[in-house]
Amino acid sequence: GLDPQSPAPDPSNPDASSDRALRTSGLVAYGALGLPLAFAALPIYVHVPRLYAEGLGLSLALVGAVLLAARVVDAVTDPLIGWANDRLPRRRLWIALALPVLGVGMVGLLAPPTGAGALWLFALLVLVSLAYSVATIAYNAWGAEVGRTPAARTRFVASREAFALVGVVLAAALPGLLAAGELAGLARLAWIFLPLLAGFGLWTLWRAPAPPAVRAGTAPAWAGLRAALGEPAFARLLAVFAANGIAAAIPSATVLFFVADVLQAAELGGLFLVLYFVAAAASLPLWLRVSQRIGKLRAWLVSMVLAVAVFAWAGLLGSGDLVAYGLICVLSGLALGADLSLPPSLLADLLARSRAERHACGHAEGSSDGRAEAIGRAEGRAEMRVKGRPAPLEAGACFGWWNFVTKANLALAAGLALPLLAVLGYAPGARDAAATAALAGVYGFVPVMLKFGAIALLWRWRGLIEPALPVAPPLAAAVCRGGEG
């Protein structure tokens, strides 16, 4: 949605292009698709375990095993989806193909037919998750490519995550408002999802700033994916993202059980989720300003410390501690805003630095760039590093690995935490002291320990993940020449 009266683009001035893309209409249009995608994610990761365990009578251990199996399948395919995105870097096309499949699958998952069991759950989870992955990988790569400066990339991510948090709040609040029972409420939620997906999806596809032309990837699948992991900064950012992500995934898989059986306030589960995500949405402008003052990485560190300081108290709560838990939801929600916006923005900056290095190599080496490209085509991008030139990071491959880690975290959280609770004697509806203590420990204390690990890793690798200075063309050219001796 650019103003037809605006001046013609000046290709020699990237900042001017960035300013045009950053107009409010463009930012809002890009972010719009984040709403239905997040609206779909919350029921998948929060409501589905309880829906199939309590509503359909499957055992908690069986539901956990099915979730683990489906998410392992899904996670393994994400890097391949990312590689395919690089081979055919048409972000809008991938999204347009994925959204109808996602809509149909969500209806089947949240409104299962009579007699649906573990096989139905597995099949629909795989279908929905694959469609969701195709859409989100292309969508995230689009956002990373359209911003020309670090500030622009942060704003595109913040727009996407602001819409996403609105979608999460709607998905958390609506089931209880649509019907008295959770089963009926989730079934109606699925039918509300379809027009949301169509409307917001079309808004983004038609009105968002067009992604820039991106050279198609040429490396074989494994070579391209391995090249991404071979980049030290990306590999370390991914490791921190994994450690931090599983710390957040365990509470997501167990929160409704905690509210129902530890706090004994099942009817308030939706309200607590709304508090959590509204606080996260409200915090996005704050984290944007903090990141501009102290850097994105240090702002993320501050949010992790806040999350640990607040969530450490959750495992000590008991029946009736509703005000205390509400305060924990609000304060940990503030920390969530940074978790959602800053890591993808750091990844977008890594991709931009890689593009700057490749661009500088082209100017510095002239025809040797063609030689490097030929090597890349024949032997894969990983081989380019052997020739002394930086292996360029591809957005699709990186976001494929990013989604892989996200899904692996959720798979481990559901596939390990739920069976662990069963082994420790907890079953949905249990009220004895030993069972609720086990649930409180898994929900509150395990994530805090994992978050400490993420903090330590991020601090250790801070200089590599977020260098003090961006890569300037002369420096990038020097990197290209390094290794040529």
Regions found by a protein language model. Name each.
Residues D19-H359, R371, E383, R389-C480, ...:
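Membrane-embedded alpha-helical bundles of multi-pass transporters/translocases
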Residues D10, A16-S17, E379, G388-A391:
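Intrinsically disordered and other compositionally biased segments
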Residues L2-R23:
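Short, Lys/Arg-rich, polar N-terminal cytosolic tail immediately upstream
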Residues A364, S368-V386:
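Long, intrinsically disordered low-complexity tandem-repeat segments
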